[in-house]
UniProtKB/Swiss-Prot annotation:
Family to which this protein belongs: Belongs to the alpha-type phospholipase A2 inhibitor family.
Superkingdom: Eukaryota
Positions of the C-type lectin domain: 62-143
Tissues showing expression: Expressed by the liver.
S-S bonds: C64-C141, C119-C133
Compartments where found: Secreted
InterPro entries: C-type_lectin-like, C-type_lectin-like/link_sf, C-type_lectin_CS, CTDL_fold
Organism: Protobothrops flavoviridis (Habu)
Name the UniProt record assigns to this protein: Phospholipase A2 inhibitor subunit A
Protein purpose: PLI binds directly phospholipase A2 in the presence or absence of calcium. Inhibitory activity of the PLI-A homotrimer is more specific than that of the PLI-B homotrimer.
Residues that carry a glycan: N103
Subunit (UniProt): Homo- or heterotrimer; homotrimer of PLI-A chains, two PLI-A and one PLI-B chains, one PLI-A and two PLI-B chains, and homotrimer of PLI-B chains (with a ratio of 1:3:3:1).
Amino acid sequence: HETDPDGQVMSSMIETLMFLQKEYANLRYAFMTVNNARSFGSGSERLYVSNKEIKTFEPLKEICEEAGGHIPSPQLENQNKAFASVLERHNKAAYLVVGDSANFTNWAAGQPNEADGTCVKADTHGSWHSASCDENLLVVCEFYFIL
């Protein structure tokens, strides 16, 4: 005897499978797009992305971490160039973090100057400047890719 005479269970399963196949294709496309942008853009394992918001330094860490990223911290010249290209595209400066043991820095002439502030911002050319942590700057987050 049949337990699904009208084929409703089978139809529902087919519909669900088709939906999942479409979702998989969309996710695969999104992943490949990001992966290709990463390898095309800078040859670096880091991707710099802005949500176009303007914020002070304080909320930046939480915003980036909620998105799965970090406050930008370029460690190499090509990473700083990739970061600067985002700033140039938006024509805005953004915060970054400079580690204590940084091998790479890109301070502008006369910088760092703590009289200007204890935070660090990069201008649209990728040059670093001391800045007030209360400045409203472009939100940019850094994402790591290890593929």
